[in-house]
Structure formats: C-alpha cells, structure tokens
C-alpha cells in the first residue's frame, strides 16, 4: 500500500508537499443533486481536499456528470426531450446544487457536451486500445432481453431491454433491482442472471445473443491485492470478493447502444458503446486527468509514470464498478494507473427511506441552501456528522433542525464574543498566542487529522475537535486567549466551515486559506469588516419549503 501524504505537526511547515488529485465518481445527469448525494462522497471529498490543502499539500480535483448513462435516455424519452439537452441542463443544476453547499472542484465538466465530447472520446478509445493491446479483452456473446416497446423500424441496438428499462430480482440478495446492479447489496449481474426479469417499458418477448467486450484479469488475486493497496474497508472488500467468487475477475465493458461513446471492433454484431459502470466510469476520471494536465501543463495524474496521489470516492451502489470495473481497467493495461485510495459510503436515508424524486421524498442541495439567512457552514457540519461511512444513516428533519440550532447557538456566542474582544484591542497592542491553549489546539488538531487519515477516513468524526474547542475559552477571556481561540477555530473549522473561517482568517491578517503551519504565527493587522455569525434558527417550515412534496413519514 502506498504511503499517504504526510501531515506535519501543527505550526510546522510541510517540507515535502505531495501532489494529490481527487476524482469522485460522476453523477448521472438525469436529475439534480440532493442531500443524499452531497452528504456522501462529495462533501466527504471536499473536506478531505481542504484538510490536505491546510496541511500544505498541492491538491487538485475534478468531477463530471454522465450524460450517456441509460437512465438519462429513460427520462428523456418520458419527457420527449433530446438526451444531450436534458443531461446538460441537469449538469448545470448539479453544479449549482453542490456549489451551494461550498462543494467545488477545479474542473466540473459535462464530457458528453459540445467540444468536450471529442476529448472524452479520445481518452475513452485510448483506454480501450490499451486494454486490447494488453490482451485484457474478451469478446463473448451474452443473452440480452428484447422487448416489444419498439417497432419494425427501431434499430436493433434500441430494442434491447437493458439499463433503466430492465427490472428484476437480485440473484444474490433477492431484493428488487434493475439495470445491471442491486442497490441493496451492491452486487452486479447480467440481465439473464436476474430472477423475475421484466421490461419497464413493455413486455420481454425474446432473449438474443449479443457480442460485447468484457474485461478479463488473468493473474490470480490481482484485484484483491489492488484493493488492499487502496485501503478498501473490509465490508466493501467482501462485496468485491463475493462478485469474484461468482463471476471471476471479469466485467462487461461495452453494451449495445446508439447514445454513448462508441468503440468499434469486427468482433461485434451490433454497435457497441462503453459501459457506464466499468470502462466509461474509468474514462470519466481519465478525462478529468487530461483536463487537469492541459490546465497545469503537467502530465496527467493518471499517467502510468505519474507520482500524484490519486483519490476516488463513491457510494455502495458503485462498489463493483469501482473495485472490478475501474480497478480492473487500470490493472489491465500499461498506459494508465489505478487509484491510491478509494472511499466508499453507504446510503443516507431521509426519514427512514431512500431519497425519491418521484415521491417528492427529497431535499435538493440547492434548495436548502437558499433558505434565507441559513448558515451553509453549520449545515455542512450537521451533514458531516451523519455521513454514512460505516452503515446507512438517517436524515431526520427534526433532528437536523435541533442539531443545526444547537451548533449555531453555541458557535455564535463564542465566536462573536472573541471577535468583539479582538476588535476592541488598542491598535498598539501586540497579538500573541497562549501557550497552554496551543497545547490543547495541538491535541485537537492531531485528533482531527486522525479522523481524516487516508488509511481510515471518518469525516463523521471531524466536528468533534471543533465542538471541543468551543469549550476551551471562558466567558470573559483575555484578548490573548480570544485571539488564540480564533486562530484555532480557523484551523480546525476550515475543512467543515470554509466560509466563516476564511473570512476570519483574512480578518486576522492572513492571506489565502487557513494553513496549519501558521497556527502560532500572529498578525496585528485587521483586514476588512469584523466577521460575525448572525444566522437565525432553522425551522420546520424552512425544511418543508425545500421539498417537492411533503416528506414521506
């Protein structure tokens, strides 16, 4: 396992900053980003990104949306709209939803749109050619269902009932499932392996052989060893092992279709496009690396000879796509490399059940961020605490409101008291940090860094250091203690609360974002307006106003 970037002690400069690139799994562009998305891999990676930057590392990031995923076609057909237009419209809304929560990436592209498509096709085909050259492709016939939704004029590729059109029972856990995967247990399967197969747009009338490209890794246990190298947690490794025991180190790389990135071979009996949950999924990351390389003038972080530390993240429903599809594609050729760490999370529920757009059982990230006078920073803290890292967690609106208001009230009192004290200092007074408080800050910083370890990430524990720091100053502190507390709050709070901590950091006379190495470096300069936390309490009416419909009980 590759060693994680070193985190220097508090107040010590990073002598060996690492290059880090973060590329979470894309979002399907068939809808907006809700709090279930945001509180999972995206807030998680935003916090990690800020933590590493705070420690002095060079961090870049990229994200995409998938406009070719089959569920885009399903929604486009239902709404009678061009799939590309629908996908790009949701791409724009997703960008707004995530940015509303302070979740931003250096590059956030729609690779299927406009001029991006040529770059995307180039990197996708380069991957497939590399896999072919390495002997990692197998062409074989798979039985696929055909339904009666089309007509005699319907192209062969569009008559297959696959992806969002296909439903059935998971062959592994028996849960209701669809497409090629089961959200309940995380497993993937071929349509002819599903029990009780049905078409969601008509009736299955026959099964026919279709030749597609499949990934095959021949070296024994190569995938399992790669998972160990990437510090995959045991529960997700078990999902991967179960898949390999059932299907071997193989996975589908192409599907029949007309809307997608095509790859041609004389072996095929229909037009084939790259599969969104293996080859195309990896191609999204390669696209991000290519885009970053163009901007930075350096080789792609995914190039085989790059020493950039690569981090990926996704939810449990993408366990097999990442562990077998993406990791397998990385191992199966010599041009591109695998992730150094992949972080998985479980589902975040809403009032005990999954987020559902159709039932109005959803809170859009961009909607809650528009609640008047809401503190996005406090909301991020609340969401981080219920990040589903070890099991499913539940976003209960009443509990969210209570927790939000409790954190807001406590932080506002201490924060505003300390900024008022510093603001009232004589201009001739020098600023110093308190040694005893710095010892406490050092302990809490180490505690937070442990929670943010890339070997065992627990974003849900990160706020503990911040809340404990709130109790480290009395009700009428000396200005030296108030100053130390504010410096510490900037350092500890930045990964979770970037808006208020950056404003505080700048007001305290520092540039850029909070840096751990500068924790004990005071400045007598005050820049701009005094920062304050004046947000109002969150109410049930605020939450109700964010919903397409009443939250399901």
Regions found by a protein language model. Name each.
Residues 2-43, 50, 62, 181, ...:
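Structured secondary-structure scaffolds
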Residues 135-213:
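Cys/His-rich short segments
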Residues 411-414, 418-421, 437-448, 459-473, ...:
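Amphipathic alpha-helices that form helix-helix packing interfaces
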Residues 2-90, 109-134, 143, 313-320:
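N-terminal catalytic cores of NTP/NDP-binding nucleotidyl/phosphoryl-transfer enzymes
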Residues 1-17, 142-145, 156-157, 165-186, ...:
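Basic, alpha-helical terminal appendages of large translation-related enzymes
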Residues 85-106:
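A glycine-rich helix N-cap at a beta->alpha junction
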Residues 389-390, 422-426, 448-455, 472-477:
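Secondary-structure edge/capping motif, primarily at the C-terminal ends of alpha-helices
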Residues 107-121, 140-155, 341-344:
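Short, glycine/charge-rich beta-strand/loop segments that flank catalytic centers
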């Amino acid at each position: 396992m590759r060693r994680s970037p070193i985190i220097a002690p508090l107040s010590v400069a990073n002598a060996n900053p690492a290059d880090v690139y973060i590329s979470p799994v894309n979002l399907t562009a068939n809808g907006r980003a809700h709090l279930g998305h945001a509180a999972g891999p995206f807030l998680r990676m935003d916090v990690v990104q800020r933590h590493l930057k705070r420690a002095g590392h060079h961090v870049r990031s990229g994200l995409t949306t998938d406009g070719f995923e089959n569920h885009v076609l399903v929604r486009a057909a239902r709404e009678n709209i061009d799939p590309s237009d629908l996908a790009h419209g949701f791409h724009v809304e997703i960008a707004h939803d995530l940015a509303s929560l302070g979740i931003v990436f250096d590059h956030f592209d729609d690779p299927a749109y406009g001029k991006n498509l040529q770059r995307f096709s180039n990197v996708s085909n380069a991957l497939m050619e590399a896999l072919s050259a390495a002997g990692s492709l197998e062409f074989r016939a798979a039985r696929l269902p055909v339904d009666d939704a089309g007509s005699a004029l319907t192209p062969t590729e569009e008559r297959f009932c696959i992806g969002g059109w296909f439903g059935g029972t998971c062959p592994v856990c028996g849960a209701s499932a669809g497409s090629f995967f089961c959200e309940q247990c995380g497993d993937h399967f071929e349509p002819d392996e599903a029990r009780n197969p049905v078409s969601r747009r008509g009736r299955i009338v026959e099964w026919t052989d279709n030749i597609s490209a499949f990934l095959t890794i021949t070296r024994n246990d190569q995938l399992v060893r790669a998972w160990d190298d990437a510090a995959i947690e045991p529960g997700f490794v078990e999902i991967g092992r179960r898949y390999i025991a059932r299907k071997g180190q193989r996975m589908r790389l192409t599907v029949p279709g007309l809307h997608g990135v095509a790859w041609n071979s004389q072996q095929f009996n229909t037009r084939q496009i790259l599969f969104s949950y293996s080859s195309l999924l990896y191609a999204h990351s390669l696209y991000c690396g290519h885009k970053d390389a163009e901007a930075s003038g350096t080789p792609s972080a995914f190039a085989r000879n790059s020493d950039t530390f690569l981090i990926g993240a996704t939810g449990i429903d993408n366990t097999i796509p990442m562990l077998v599809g993406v990791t397998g594609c990385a191992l199966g050729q010599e041009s591109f490399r695998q992730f150094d760490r992949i972080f998985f999370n479980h589902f975040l529920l809403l009032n005990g059940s999954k987020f559902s757009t159709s039932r109005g059982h959803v809170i859009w990230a961009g909607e809650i961020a528009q609640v008047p006078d809401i503190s996005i920073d406090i909301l991020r803290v609340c969401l981080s605490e219920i990040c589903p890292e070890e099991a499913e967690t539940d976003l209960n609106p009443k509990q969210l409101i209570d927790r939000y208001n409790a954190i807001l009230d406590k932080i506002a009192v201490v924060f505003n008291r300390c900024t008022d004290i510093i603001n009232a200092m004589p201009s001739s007074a020098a600023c110093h940090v308190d040694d005893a408080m710095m010892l406490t800050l050092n302990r809490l910083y180490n505690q937070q860094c442990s929670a943010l370890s890339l070997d065992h990430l627990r974003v849900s524990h990160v706020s503990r250091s911040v809340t404990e720091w709130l109790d480290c100053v009395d009700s009428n502190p000396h200005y030296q203690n108030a100053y130390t507390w504010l410096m510490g709050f900037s350092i500890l709070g930045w990964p979770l609360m970037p808006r208020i901590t950056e404003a505080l950091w700048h007001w305290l006379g520092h540039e850029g974002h909070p840096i751990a190495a500068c924790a004990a470096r005071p400045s007598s300069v005050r820049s701009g307006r005094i920062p304050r936390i004046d947000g109002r309490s969150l109410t049930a009416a605020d939450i109700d106003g964010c919903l397409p419909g009443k939250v399901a009980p």
